[in-house]
UniProtKB/Swiss-Prot annotation:
A zinc finger (FPG-type) spans 229-263. GO terms for molecular function: class I DNA-(apurinic or apyrimidinic site) endonuclease activity; damaged DNA binding; oxidized pyrimidine nucleobase lesion DNA N-glycosylase activity; zinc ion binding. This is Endonuclease 8. One of its GO terms (biological process) is base-excision repair. It comes from Escherichia coli O6:H1 (strain CFT073 / ATCC 700928 / UPEC). Keywords: DNA damage, DNA repair, DNA-binding, Glycosidase, Hydrolase, Lyase, Metal-binding, Multifunctional enzyme, Zinc, Zinc-finger. InterPro entries: DNA_glyclase/AP_lyase_DNA-bd, DNA_glyclase_Znf_dom_DNA_BS, EcNei-like_N, Endonuclease-VIII, FPG_cat, MutM-like_N-ter, Ribosomal_uS13-like_H2TH, Znf_DNA_glyclase/AP_lyase. It comes from the Bacteria. HAMAP family: Endonuclease_8. It holds the Pfam family Fapy_DNA_glyco. Its EC number is 3.2.2.-, 4.2.99.18. The gene is nei. The active site is at P2, E3, K53, R253. DNA binds at Q70, R125, N169.
Length: 263
């Protein structure tokens, strides 16, 4: 399943295609959304927001399309008039004069008013998004030490969207490797330096992944570009200590770590 950085890049692609352009055609598959089709013609998308793995497509008439891709949903951008050859089931079409965005296969789709945005069950449950530029390490540290989270093992906590939205399995293992901790550690047991390092890594690594993952290091950025240090690298030597990276299962998900320097 895509994690926060991949969801944010998808949102960027949608914004680049249709943001600010009048909608010339709107179509929804679900009957409960049909009445919104005519209300959105002539309106435009103001911005696309991510809340963890959910997308909020905001329109100029203050309505917001909530969509969660879950396992199978996918957005595509096409030239207007193009009909992709696919076996997926179309759920949403938002068309402008030159570009159209299409949502396939998702089942969790709703239209929300500003009031409903503040009471939506999923949006109420999720924590701050790690890619929110206004989220600071100080706020993350406060959440780590809060009564709700301080006694939780990181193996489960870093997958819990109520703690921080947008984290997932590859980010979980890369963050813990970066700070030299295991999945069994808890925030209440860390010293001040460890807490500070973890709070920064919880933001820095997702943001680096969002900004640079998939780019080729052609200009020799000396490690600044995101790349996996332990994820899917079991059996390989750890670049930090030379120990052998191992794979186990924690919180029902594959977990990669180096016993030599994560303890």
């Amino acid at each position: 399943m895509p994690e926060g950085p991949e969801i944010r890049r998808a949102a960027d692609n949608l914004e680049a295609a249709i943001k600010g352009k009048p909608l010339t055609d709107v179509w929804f598959a679900f009957p409960q959304l049909k009445s919104y089709q005519s209300r959105l013609i002539g309106q435009h998308v103001t911005h696309v927001e991510t809340r963890g793995k959910a997308l909020l497509t905001h329109f100029s008439n203050d309505l917001t399309l909530y969509s969660h891709n879950q396992l199978y949903g996918v957005w595509r951008v096409v030239d207007t008039g193009e009909e992709p050859q696919t076996t997926r089931v179309l759920r949403v079409k938002l068309q402008t004069a030159d570009k159209t965005i299409l949502l396939y296969s998702a089942s969790d789709i709703e239209m929300l008013t500003p009031e409903q945005l503040t009471t939506h069950p999923f949006l109420q449950r999720v924590g701050p998004d790690v890619l929110d530029p206004n989220l600071t390490p100080e706020v993350v540290k406060e959440r780590l030490l809060s009564p709700r989270f301080r006694n939780r093992q990181f193996a489960g906590l870093l997958l819990d969207q109520a703690f921080l939205a947008g984290l997932g399995n590859y980010l979980r293992v890369e963050i813990l490797w970066q700070v030299g901790l295991t999945g069994n550690h808890k925030a209440k047991d860390l010293n001040a330096a460890q807490l500070d390092a973890l709070a920064h890594a919880l933001l820095d690594i997702p943001r680096l992944s969002y900004a640079t993952r998939g780019q080729v290091d052609e200009n020799k950025y000396h490690g600044a570009l995101f790349r996996f240090k332990v994820f899917h690298r079991d059996g390989e030597p750890c670049e930090r200590c030379g120990g052998i990276i191992e794979k186990t299962t924690l919180s029902s998900r594959p977990f990669y770590w180096c016993p030599g320097c994560q303890h």
